[in-house]
């Protein structure tokens, strides 16, 4: 078994959070090595690489760069596209953290003989009744626990999370107070790293640009389709079903005398059903690909909280396992716009119990 020494491998993005994490780990007496992953470079910019290298040099810590663009394309971006083509609403940041970023960090650390792993995530870790749990950050506005429900004990036991007890404003002040003015003023990243502004523009570029990478067979013809009401009556034409998500109201390109929202997406017919917000409420859902730290804390309990969106929509629920191996969630109060492909995360007593991917939901 690897010795638990004071060496730690830190994921460094070049941003404020991972930079401050490096400083905090050094102050705590750790020997820090930084690794910057090349996952995706928006508009081809590599400024983040130079920023991470420069910070590592200034702090006097080791630094390496790891090119993961191919695996990121295959596991994250292609999944993202495939999910929308299936009429689902993916959460790529959840998949990336649980199946790529943290496992890759562990793999590199193993090769270097390093036990501890760290990032600039705003989360905490707790040891309760023989298990490690992720816990929400002190800064509720920056808390990222929702994205980490898929991590297992072999990763959790190695994690160091120096940002969990700090707010973002405190992190900026901390960096500025130590002479890292540029670090303290870096902008926050917003949204998905490979399409931070609008996923529809990204999808259209991937799906509809015949001049794209034909070796990857990304180009797929997307034609206009029909908006229907709940009775199957034609309302208007739409641009193509992949460009809509469950619960969407804005950007439909139609004007009606009532508010309507996307209720159903049918890839096989290229039809999108619109309905009132009330009609989107559901009181049940099922999860696949789930991970739970300790099932006894979740199953049969009525005080579990489930979240289906980062920072939004939480409710109390009860959870059982179906004969098919899915998690069946019964909500105490209906939630609106539950979409297949989204993630759901469970919380209880201030701990992240686990989560899974929504595979289907029923009407109230």
Curated annotation (Swiss-Prot):
It catalyses: S-sulfanyl-L-cysteinyl-[protein] + uridine(34) in tRNA + AH2 + ATP = 2-thiouridine(34) in tRNA + L-cysteinyl-[protein] + A + AMP + diphosphate + H(+). The keyword Nucleotide-binding applies. Gene3D superfamilies: Adenine nucleotide alpha hydrolases-like domains, HUPs, Translation factors. The active site is at residues 96, 193. One of its GO terms (cellular component) is cytoplasm. Keywords: ATP-binding, Cytoplasm, Disulfide bond, Nucleotide-binding, RNA-binding, Transferase, tRNA processing, tRNA-binding. The record marks 121, 342 as: Interaction with tRNA. ATP binds at residues 11-18, 37, 120. Its EC number is 2.8.1.13. GO terms for molecular function: ATP binding; tRNA binding; tRNA-uridine 2-sulfurtransferase activity. Disulfide bonds join 96-193. Residues 142-144, 309-310 are annotated as: Interaction with tRNA. Transmembrane segments: none annotated. It is found in: Cytoplasm. InterPro entries: MnmA-like, MnmA-like_C, MnmA-like_central, MnmA-like_central_sf, Rhodanese-like_dom, Rossmann-like_a/b/a_fold. GO terms for biological process: tRNA wobble position uridine thiolation. Belongs to the MnmA/TRMU family. Catalyzes the 2-thiolation of uridine at the wobble position (U34) of tRNA, leading to the formation of s(2)U34. This is tRNA-specific 2-thiouridylase MnmA 1.
């Amino acid at each position: 078994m690897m010795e638990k020494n004071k060496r730690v491998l830190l994921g460094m993005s070049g941003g404020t959070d991972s930079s401050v994490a490096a400083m905090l780990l050094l102050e705590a007496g750790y020997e820090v090595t930084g690794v910057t992953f090349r996952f995706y470079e928006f508009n081809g910019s590599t400024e983040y690489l130079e920023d991470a290298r420069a910070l590592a040099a200034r702090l006097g810590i080791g630094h390496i760069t790891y090119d993961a663009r191919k695996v990121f394309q295959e596991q994250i971006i292609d999944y993202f596209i495939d999910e929308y083509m299936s009429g689902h609403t993916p959460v790529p940041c959840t998949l990336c953290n649980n199946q790529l970023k943290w496992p890759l960090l562990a793999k590199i650390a193993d090769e270097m003989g390093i036990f501890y792993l760290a990032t600039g995530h705003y989360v905490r870790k707790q040891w309760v009744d023989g298990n490690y749990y992720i816990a929400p950050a002190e800064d509720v506005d920056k808390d990222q626990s929702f994205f980490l429900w898929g991590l297992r004990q072999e990763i959790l036991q190695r994690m160091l999370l120096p940002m969990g007890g700090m707010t973002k404003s405190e992190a900026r002040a901390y960096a500025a107070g130590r002479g890292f003015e540029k670090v303290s003023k870096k902008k926050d990243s917003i949204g998905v790293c490979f399409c931070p502004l609008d996923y529809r523009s990204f999808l259209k570029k991937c799906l509809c640009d015949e001049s794209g990478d034909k070796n990857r067979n990304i180009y797929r013809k997307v034609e206009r389709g029909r908006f229907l009401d709940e009775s199957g009556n034609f309302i208007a034409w739409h641009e193509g079903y992949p460009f809509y998500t469950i619960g969407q109201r804005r950007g439909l390109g139609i004007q009606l005398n009532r508010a309507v929202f996307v209720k159903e997406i049918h890839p096989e017919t290229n039809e999108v059903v619109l309905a009132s917000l009330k009609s989107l409420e559901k009181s049940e859902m099922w999860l696949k690909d789930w991970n739970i730290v300790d099932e006894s804390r979740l199953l049969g309990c009525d005080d579990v909280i489930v979240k289906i969106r980062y920072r939004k929509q939480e409710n109390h629920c009860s959870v059982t396992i179906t004969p098919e191996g899915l998690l069946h969630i019964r909500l105490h109060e209906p939630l609106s716009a539950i979409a297949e492909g989204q993630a759901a995360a469970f919380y209880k007593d201030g701990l992240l119990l686990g989560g899974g991917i929504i595979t289907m939901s029923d009407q109230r």
